[in-house]
């Protein structure tokens, strides 16, 4: 227990002495330490920290699990009161001992009243875990390497102890013009530097804080430094320029912070950092903060830090995302991404802020331009001037537009409150980038949503991302048109509620005339127009995502004969009911629910409308679906997951892993890479034929045939597929007699449409 917090000035082995030090005559910093010690000891419960990985010198690691161990229930606290009565008295001397949360309230930690007041005005009343972990070691002057999840309050973790010490140094002293900085904060991007400056200014308005970065006037920054400054925040390039120009002197820096340290010390930044470190006094306190901390960063960090204490609230656990972020993944084709994007934003952002991340500047511009037709959006990337960058970020923060399309320049350090949705338009290059992108939402304990777009060829990468980050995606389909319409209407209604009453008065006469003329349709027309749907929306396939197609579901009551066990039986049924539907049918997939013997398939919108109006043989039902049911190839495979597990739903001259459309679940055989197993049937990659027990007498077909979709699956319109215009199965060929069985009565020799018993 003596090494629990590694504080040489007060020993935990004598809690009574620590409590006594918290009396009225103790200094604020001493009272803070005493309160924290007594709280930690009492909550430890007689050595219970050992299992959680207590801090040990010299390079200690404090795990997040240790902090979770501190959060005991009220019942446990009451049980421990008798054993730790003297410690309880010490806490009361600090502030009454009204509970653990109160003991770690900002107001009860001995911080300067001015700092407490400004933090409370910002709604900050208690410490977050990273702030808790850093506070005491930082006040003791320890060098630190701190790691925590994105969006958990790292800026104030180093800001609070530094501000406290600067305020205490300045107490009773006059402000000296031309003073040189005592704090230097290095940040990898202009956006992060400005965020840090904003946090410090809002928390300590009486301290002079200057932010320096490239892309803006050099003279303005020179003048600000010449007037005297306490804290300098900036990017390495501009800081070096100011040092070389004689405008920035670092001889009195007592505190150095490297924020997003893994980027600061990456290739290309290390030399800049070393150049700056050469200008700093040897006697200083250095702290590195980052959401990710690879081993090689720690190695480099130890060159610049003195016996650093490592505070790691992530540890070796895979999950690095903040809790509260709901993750979705959606498989799409490259051509359907932009069409689906606006619908995803409409349904999942619900009128809130969205950041869409792209890989290239060109994509950012093009996606933003495409979205502008339906949703207000702007692009942010490296080619945009600093002035325009700031206008864009301010407009996004203020809600002047709701969608920001950005390259990864905005992923690190960009602090925009209340971002509801993150969309990865392209897969990130690495897990760390995914974590930082997604971390723009769900910040400070709030809920958020992140959606990953990927193509069929990227499934293995998505699986690797799940494994590396330790997360799980919910796989979704594009929103149905009905969902888009509903979300659009809700957003418009919320917007209408915000219209000023004085503005409404000007439009009442016109509204009354329109109401008399159109009745309820007047308001409905206004909602449709404001939602962007002045014209009827075009349907979109839930399978291929193509506009103008409708996905239908066919089911059969088990009491009415054999069910649909293959796409062939579906095309056969359609040919009996509607020759147009049989000719134009798109991809066909069987549903996974064995109790409901059915299938889903695509049809052009007009043909689907006609089919839905037709009378069907008894026991059969065709309905339009707004969400795909579970399909027979939804099961996991080696490198595929979600409901779209085949690259093209077919076998066009390549191996296709995952379950297929032939009526049975399958996967790779455990005894070899080259054998693919499907519900008892096998497909060998070294053989150009495949066994097909379900398609009538062991018919053999070359692998290059296509089954099931427009170009690559059963029910295709190509000449080599079931149910197509030139197909030998399921089409109405007047030159051949019908040899199958009627789907109505079960007798052979005639179709259901010609059945005498219907």
UniProtKB/Swiss-Prot annotation:
Keywords annotated in UniProt: ATP-binding, Chloroplast, Helicase, Hydrolase, Metal-binding, Nucleotide-binding, Plastid, Ribosome biogenesis, RNA-binding, Transit peptide, Zinc, Zinc-finger
Molecular function, one GO term: RNA binding
Residue span of motif DEAD box: 259-262
ZnF bounds (CCHC-type): 740-757
Entry keyword annotation includes Membrane: no
Residue span(s) of domain Helicase C-terminal: 340-485
Top-tier EC class: hydrolase
Pfam families for the chain: DEAD, GUCT, Helicase_C, zf-CCHC
Gly residues bias (residue ranges): 658-669
Gene Ontology biological process terms from the UniProt entry: chloroplast organization; Group II intron splicing; ribosome biogenesis
Residues covered by region (Disordered): 71-97, 625-737
Compositionally biased residues, Low complexity: 703-737
Composition skew (Acidic residues), residue ranges: 73-91
Transit peptide location on this chain: 1-62
Chain ranges of the Helicase ATP-binding domain: 135-311
Reaction equation(s) it catalyzes: ATP + H2O = ADP + phosphate + H(+)
Positions with a binding annotation for ATP: 148-155
Ranges of compositional bias, category Basic and acidic residues: 673-687
Location of the protein in the cell: Plastid, Chloroplast
Enzyme Commission numbers on file: 3.6.4.13
Motif (Q motif): 104-132
Gene3D superfamilies named among the record's database cross-references: P-loop containing nucleotide triphosphate hydrolases, Zinc finger, CCHC-type
The record's note on its domains: The Q motif is unique to and characteristic of the DEAD box family of RNA helicases and controls ATP binding and hydrolysis.
Family: Belongs to the DEAD box helicase family. DDX21/DDX50 subfamily.
Role played: Nuclear genome-encoded factor involved in ribosome biogenesis in chloroplasts. Binds specific group II introns in chloroplasts and facilitates their splicing. Required for normal development of chloroplasts.
Protein name (Swiss-Prot/TrEMBL): DEAD-box ATP-dependent RNA helicase 3, chloroplastic
Natural source organism: Oryza sativa subsp. japonica (Rice)
Lineage: Eukaryota, Viridiplantae, Streptophyta, Embryophyta, Tracheophyta
């Amino acid at each position: 227990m003596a090494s629990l917090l590694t504080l040489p000035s007060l020993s935990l082995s004598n809690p009574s002495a620590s409590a006594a030090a918290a009396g009225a005559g103790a200094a604020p910093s001493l009272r803070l330490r005493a309160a924290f010690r007594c709280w930690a000891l009492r909550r430890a419960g007689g050595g219970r920290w050992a299992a959680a990985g207590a801090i040990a010198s010299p390079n200690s690691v404090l795990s997040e699990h240790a902090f979770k161990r501190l959060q005991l229930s009220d019942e446990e606290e009451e049980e421990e009161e008798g054993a730790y009565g003297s410690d309880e008295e010490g806490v009361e001397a600090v502030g009454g001992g009204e509970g653990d949360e109160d003991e770690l309230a900002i107001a009860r930690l001995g911080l300067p009243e001015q700092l407490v007041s400004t933090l409370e005005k910002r709604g900050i009343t208690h410490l977050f875990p990273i702030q808790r972990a850093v506070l005491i070691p930082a006040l003791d002057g320890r060098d630190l390497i701190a790691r925590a999840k994105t969006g958990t309050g790292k800026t104030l973790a180093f800001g609070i102890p530094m501000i406290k010490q600067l305020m205490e140094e300045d107490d009773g002293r006059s402000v000296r013009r031309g003073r040189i900085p005592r704090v230097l904060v290095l940040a990898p991007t202009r956006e992060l530097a400005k965020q840090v400056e904003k946090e410090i200014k809002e928390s300590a308005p009486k301290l002079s804080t200057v932010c320096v970065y490239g892309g803006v006037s050099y003279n303005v920054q020179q003048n600000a430094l010449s007037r005297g400054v306490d804290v300098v925040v900036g990017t390495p390039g501009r800081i070096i320029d100011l040092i070389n120009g004689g405008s920035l002197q670092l001889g009195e820096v007592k505190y150095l912070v490297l924020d997003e340290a893994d980027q600061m010390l990456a290739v290309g930044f290390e030399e800049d950092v070393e150049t700056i470190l050469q200008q700093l006094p040897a006697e200083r306190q250095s702290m590195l903060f980052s959401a990710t901390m690879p081993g090689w960063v720690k190695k480099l960090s130890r060159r610049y830090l003195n016996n650093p204490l490592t505070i790691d609230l992530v540890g070796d656990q895979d999950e690095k995302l903040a809790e509260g972020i709901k993750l979705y993944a959606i498989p799409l084709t490259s051509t359907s991404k932009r069409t689906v994007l606006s619908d995803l934003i409409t349904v999942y952002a619900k009128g809130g802020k969205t950041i869409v991340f792209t890989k290239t500047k060109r994509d950012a511009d093009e996606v933003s331009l495409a979205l502008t037709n339906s949703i207000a959006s702007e692009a942010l990337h490296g080619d945009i001037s600093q002035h325009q960058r700031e206008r864009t970020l301010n407009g996004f923060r203020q809600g002047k537009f709701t969608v920001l399309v950005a390259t990864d320049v905005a992923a690190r350090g960009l602090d925009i409150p209340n971002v509801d949705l993150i969309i990865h338009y392209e897969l990130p290059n690495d897990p760390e980038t995914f974590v930082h992108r997604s971390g723009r939402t769900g910040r400070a304990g709030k809920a958020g949503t992140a959606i990953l777009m990927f193509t069929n060829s990227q499934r293995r990468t998505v699986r690797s991302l799940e494994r590396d980050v330790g997360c799980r995606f919910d796989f979704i389909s594009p929103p149905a048109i009905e969902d888009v319409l509903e979300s659009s209407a809700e957003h418009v209604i919320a917007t209408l509620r915000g219209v000023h009453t004085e503005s409404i008065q000007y439009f009442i006469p016109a509204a009354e005339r329109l109401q008399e003329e159109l009745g309820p349709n007047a308001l409905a027309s206004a909602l449709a127009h404001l939602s962007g749907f002045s014209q009827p929306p075009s349907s979109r396939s839930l399978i291929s995502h193509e506009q103008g197609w409708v996905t239908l579901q066919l089911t059969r009551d088990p009491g009415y004969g054999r069910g649909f066990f293959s796409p062939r039986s579906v095309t056969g049924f359609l040919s009996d009911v509607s020759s147009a539907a049989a000719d134009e049918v798109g991809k066909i997939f069987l549903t996974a629910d064995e109790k409901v013997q059915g299938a889903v398939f695509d049809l052009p919108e007009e043909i689907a409308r006609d089919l839905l109006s037709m009378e069907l043989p008894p026991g059969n039902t065709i309905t339009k679906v707004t969400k795909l049911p579970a399909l027979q190839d939804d099961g996991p495979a080696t490198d595929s997951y979600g409901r779209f597990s085949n690259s093209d739903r077919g076998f066009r001259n390549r191996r296709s892993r995952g379950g297929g459309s032939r009526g049975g679940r399958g996967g790779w055989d455990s005894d070899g890479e080259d054998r693919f197993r499907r519900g008892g049937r096998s497909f060998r990659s070294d053989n150009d034929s495949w066994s097909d027990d379900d398609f009538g007498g062991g018919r053999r077909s070359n692998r290059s045939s296509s089954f099931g979709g427009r170009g690559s699956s059963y029910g295709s319109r190509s000449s080599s597929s079931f149910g197509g215009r030139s197909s030998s199965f399921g089409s109405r060929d007047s030159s051949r007699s019908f040899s199958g069985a009627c789907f109505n009565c079960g007798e052979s020799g005639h179709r259901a449409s010609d059945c005498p018993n219907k």
